Amino acid sequence: MAHYISLFVRAVFVENMALAFFLGMCTFLAVSKKVSTASGLGVAVTVVLGLAVPINNLVYNLVLRDGALVEGVDLSFLNFITFIGVIAALVQILEMILDKYFPALYNALGIFLPLIAVNCAIFGGVSFMVQRDYNFPESIVYGFGSGIGWMLAIVAMAGIREKMKYANVPAGLRGLGITFITTGLMALGFMSFSGVQL
């Protein structure tokens, strides 16, 4: 149990997708203007990561890995296309659910919801799972931990950006300029976790 808690904390803080690996920055910067929208996207990314990583773990270990289907047959060259297909299918299912049951959030996310399918944070989580050879329970913990870490980062950024509306920011830094600086400072804060051994 301690191993899974350690993996979860490492995925949320030490190896944060947004602030340690800078994955998913396009949606991170574009949707982090309001806390409500950022938290909605954060939940959507957490759900997709939490499902995509373990499902792709099963696909990789049962179908694509060397000798998984037939001894001596290695289908791992199909990793990327298969992982992208699974992620795209999950995003489509999530999009249909949000459209039917949460139309306000669906409209607030707009074009960024389909872009979750090509969000590099999700593909990065799946790639790290394969690279680190996580088993199925580890992939569940890592997927949800990575999603919660990304959601923590985007909600914190949205809260800071809402407060910065009332700050006296120099004209040349307004908009994305101060957002990039703030993201860098947040990343420096998360770097303090890098020495933690779990």
UniProtKB/Swiss-Prot annotation:
An example Gene Ontology CC term for this record: Gram-negative-bacterium-type cell wall
Function per UniProt: NQR complex catalyzes the reduction of ubiquinone-1 to ubiquinol by two successive reactions, coupled with the transport of Na(+) ions from the cytoplasm to the periplasm. NqrA to NqrE are probably involved in the second step, the conversion of ubisemiquinone to ubiquinol.
Gene this protein is translated from: nqrE
Compartments in which it is found: Cell inner membrane
Annotated transmembrane regions: 11-31, 35-55, 77-97, 110-130, 140-160, 176-196
Any single biological process term in GO: sodium ion transport
Topology class, membrane: Multi-pass membrane protein
Sample GO molecular function, one term: oxidoreductase activity, acting on NAD(P)H, quinone or similar compound as acceptor
Taxonomic superkingdom: Bacteria
Name the UniProt record assigns to this protein: Na(+)-translocating NADH-quinone reductase subunit E
Protein family (similarity comment): Belongs to the NqrDE/RnfAE family.
Subunit structure and binding partners: Composed of six subunits; NqrA, NqrB, NqrC, NqrD, NqrE and NqrF.
Species assigned in the record: Klebsiella pneumoniae subsp. pneumoniae (strain ATCC 700721 / MGH 78578)
Keyword 4Fe-4S part of the UniProt annotation: no
Assigned EC number: 7.2.1.1
Main location: membrane
Keywords annotated in UniProt: Cell inner membrane, Cell membrane, Ion transport, Membrane, NAD, Sodium, Sodium transport, Translocase, Transmembrane, Transmembrane helix, Transport, Ubiquinone
Reactions catalysed: a ubiquinone + n Na(+)(in) + NADH + H(+) = a ubiquinol + n Na(+)(out) + NAD(+)
The keyword Hydrolase appears for this protein: no
One Pfam short name: Rnf-Nqr
Residues annotated as signal peptide: none
